[in-house]
């Protein structure tokens, strides 16, 4: 996000929700500002802060898993904001489950996938 906006990481940290919303409106796009408590903002003013996830998601490759999840939800026909909010939530929840088994710093991005399947299975009832 720092590269896209020209803002420093420190500046981005000062008002994550406000900055995500400002750029969602400016770019007319849903913005996902990853980090501790990832922010999802839409051009129409909706903002959510994700309660799931842990520092293990800072590992390279976890964003690729999130991107794949988001693409899959979009392909299923969910509107962009809902798809982003769902993908971010499920990604973090699956990572929390993986961290409970392997530790936040022991988990790898591929550990998220089986936990995602377990989340779907539990909530499909």
Language-model-derived ranges and their functions:
Residues 1-52:
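Glycine-rich phosphate/dinucleotide-binding loop and adjoining beta-alpha-beta core of small-molecule
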Residues 93-125:
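Charged C-terminal helix
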Residues 33-35, 42, 51-52, 61-63, ...:
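Active-site proximal loops enriched in glycine and acidic residues that flank catalytic Cys/His/Asp
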Residues 3, 13, 45, 57, ...:
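N-terminal loops that bind phosphate or other acidic moieties
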Residues 18-21, 48, 67-68, 81, ...:
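Feature representing long, continuous alpha-helical segments
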Residues 2-3, 59-90:
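Short, small-residue alpha-helix embedded
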Residues 2-6, 50-57, 67, 71, ...:
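Short beta-alpha connecting loops at secondary-structure transitions
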């Amino acid at each position: 996000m720092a590269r896209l906006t020209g803002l420093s990481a420190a500046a981005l940290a000062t008002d994550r929700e406000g900055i995500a919303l400002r750029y969602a409106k400016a770019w007319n796009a849903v913005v996902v500002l990853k980090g501790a408590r990832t922010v999802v903002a839409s051009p129409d003013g909706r903002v959510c802060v994700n309660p799931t996830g842990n520092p293990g998601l800072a590992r390279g490759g976890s964003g690729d898993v999130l991107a794949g999840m988001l693409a899959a939800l979009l392909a299923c026909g969910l509107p962009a904001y809902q798809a982003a909010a769902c993908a971010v939530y499920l990604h973090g929840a699956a990572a929390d489950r993986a961290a409970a088994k392997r530790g936040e710093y022991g988990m790898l991005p591929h550990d998220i996938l089986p936990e995602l399947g377990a989340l779907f299975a539990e909530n499909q009832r």
